[in-house]
Structure formats: structure tokens, C-alpha cells
Amino acid sequence: MARLKDKFSNEIAPALQQKFNYKNVMQIPKLEKVVINVGVGEAIQNSKAIDAAVGDLSKITGQKPVVTRAKKSIAAFKLRTGMPIGTKVTLRGDRMYEFVDRLMNVALPRVRDFHGVSDKAFDGRGNYTLGIKEQLIFPEIEYDKIDKVRGMDIIFVTTAKTDEEARELLGMLGMPFRK
């Protein structure tokens, strides 16, 4: 069992139930899934760029990413419908908890001038989005092997009804919010 999942069921869930006075254990907010998205704009000119992004993302998450394709053609960007423009991975269960654990305890502390993540990136429905500027913060990525520094979006989808509940949940899981 993942370390963070164990901590959630033994410590965090009872604390949340007490704080928000939930009558039923099913009301306790929990992490549903984590979606990691890498937009690869240069894939329009260079088709090899998408393969590099897929490789990086599979090393980071331990799961094969799905290639996202353009829904519409946009002439100004020389983009056609169906062209690959990014990759994404949806993590659930133990893999999700292991990734979140690695992100919070290993990757985020490696960011230069890191003072915590913004607590303003909640969407009003209890989901949190985190933008990362470079994939090098993950120890699985070797500096010499990358072709280009790429950023990524990490979306934490929770069952929380409000942002306050989601903030409390992520804070207890170890998300380093800015003071």
C-alpha cells in the first residue's frame, strides 16, 4: 500500500471528518485522480518532439501517456484537425498516491527559489491545478538526455465540494502552500 494512501486512511480522513463535522464517511473529500498534461506546441513542425514528451512523461509517471490531438484546424498556427499537439496521463489508485508523494517530497523541493505553491489555483469545485515550468525537477529525468525543457500542468481532482475542503485535504497530504 502506498505510504500516502495509508496516511490518508489512518490520519487525514478522521481529521477531516472531525473538522468539517461529516456524519457519513462517504462525505469525506478524497483525491480521485491526478491528470498530468504536457502541451507540445512544436510538434507541428517537429514530429519527434511528441515522442520525447511521451518518453519523459512515462518515466515520470510509470504509465504510458495518451497522445492528445487537435480538435479543430487553426490556419494561423498551421494546425490541422487530428495533428498530435500534446500528451497526458491520468493516474488513479496507488500509482496516483505514489506520484503525489514523490511530487511533494522530492520534486517540488528541487525547484529553484521555491517558496510554496499558490493557493489561488482552485477552480471553485474543489479541484487544484499546478503548473510546472520544467520536467527536470523529477529525479527520473536525466539532464543530459533531454532535448528541450518542457513544462506541464498537474491537475488534482478531488471529491471535495468546496475549495476550502480541497485546500485542507491537499494541505494535510503535504502540499506546500505559500504562507
Swiss-Prot record:
Keywords for this protein: Ribonucleoprotein, Ribosomal protein, RNA-binding, rRNA-binding, tRNA-binding
GO BP annotation list: translation
Specify whether Flavoprotein is a keyword of the entry: no
Give the molecular function GO annotations.
rRNA binding; structural constituent of ribosome; tRNA binding
Q: Which family does it belong to?
A: Belongs to the universal ribosomal protein uL5 family.
Described purpose of this protein according to its UniProt entry: This is one of the proteins that bind and probably mediate the attachment of the 5S RNA into the large ribosomal subunit, where it forms part of the central protuberance. In the 70S ribosome it contacts protein S13 of the 30S subunit (bridge B1b), connecting the 2 subunits; this bridge is implicated in subunit movement. Contacts the P site tRNA; the 5S rRNA and some of its associated proteins might help stabilize positioning of ribosome-bound tRNAs.
Protein name (record): Large ribosomal subunit protein uL5
Which gene name belongs to this protein? Answer: rplE
